[in-house]
UniProtKB/Swiss-Prot annotation:
Homodimer. GO terms for biological process: 'de novo' pyrimidine nucleobase biosynthetic process; 'de novo' UMP biosynthetic process. Belongs to the OMP decarboxylase family. Type 1 subfamily. Catalyzes the decarboxylation of orotidine 5'-monophosphate (OMP) to uridine 5'-monophosphate (UMP). It comes from Streptococcus equi subsp. zooepidemicus (strain MGCS10565). It comes from the Bacteria. InterPro entries: Aldolase_TIM, OMPdecase, OMPdecase_AS, OMPdecase_bac, OMPdeCOase_dom, RibuloseP-bd_barrel. Keywords: Decarboxylase, Lyase, Pyrimidine biosynthesis. The active site is at K63. This is Orotidine 5'-phosphate decarboxylase. Its EC number is 4.1.1.23.
Amino acid sequence: MREERPIIALDFPSFEEVKSFLSLFPADERLYVKIGMELYYAEGPDIVRYVKSLGHSVFLDLKLHDIPNTVKSTMAVLSRLGIDMTTVQAAGGVEMLRAAREGLGQGPILIAVTQLTSTSEEQMREDQNIQSTLLASVLHYAKRTAQAKLDGVVCSAHEVKAIKSEVPAGFVCLTPGIRPTGADIGDQKRVMTPHQARAIGSDYIVLGRPITQATDPVKAYHQIKAEWNR
């Protein structure tokens, strides 16, 4: 179920900057955008309602991680915003993941974060005290996520092939850490180009700065979209 539109990360701190950025695109162009913690905590549910009013799809990336009942009730609130996708932390455990699914319902896509693409194996071992390999940790989280009946995971594109060999068909992999050829990788440590991500089986890709900080964001978006779909 590969999504043809790259997801644009709206990594802006304010409503006005989002409005200014989205106004660059033709009114009839339907985008898929990511609203993360900074923007959501600054502007609240109104930013989601505004973006949805323009006809765009919304990936609300809040990475919930709390006791099951709290996650369930929070997801029920988020479901009323009409979001298309959202996230929880796989480390919260199967019970929490199932509670998230119950609270959100069956409409929106619900995916779990495995290991952040900014995390190296050394950091994982030192900071999380997980002494396996990074891939083994990601695969463990992916299998537990599938067991909880979620739709998929957030992972590095480097891990997609291994994940899909371990989970049921239709399990989706959303991959951040995507950069066009020659672009600055920023704080990401495990990156791929859009074309490489497609070839390896990614279903969704997320990009922020290569589009939002481009001299011509609309042109940059369409170039990346063309690379993703070729």
